[in-house]
Amino acid sequence: MSIDYEVVYQGKVSARLESRNNKRNNGFATMMQQFNAKKYLNKRMKLSAFIKTDKVIESTGLWMRVDDKYEDILQFDNMSNRQIKGTNSWNIYSVVLDIPEQSEVISMGILLNGSGKVWVDNIKFTNVDLNIPSTNMSMERNLLDEPINLSFED
């Protein structure tokens, strides 16, 4: 992770994450911040940034998570359903999450899975209207009403 003065979208600097080619492409890097959710309770917040990539093999993207005081995840999006791969020019990306009343902590950043380079610039965290759809990745499970096949014969 470093500051880059040459590859920028706007202004004088961008941030760069880089993972060198290695035999195991299962590593990841993240640049993140974590802060108190109190100021944002009952709001819909959008994390947006301009992202540029070079030879990203696995994926990269923004991510945001909202936790309660027990560190349970209330809202989450890591763009895994809309991954950025390969080599791409500057483009704007965003994640949008609701900040429920019981929220305590907001974590957010950019993630690089596998090898490649990613630059991020012009990051914004803004309150948006409810007509902007949430990108929350549902963590709900569809549970059965009762146990089944306890004899393993069905």
Over which residues does each language-model region extend?
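Extracellular and organelle-lumenal recognition/adhesion modules and their flexible linkers in secreted
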Residues: 1-154
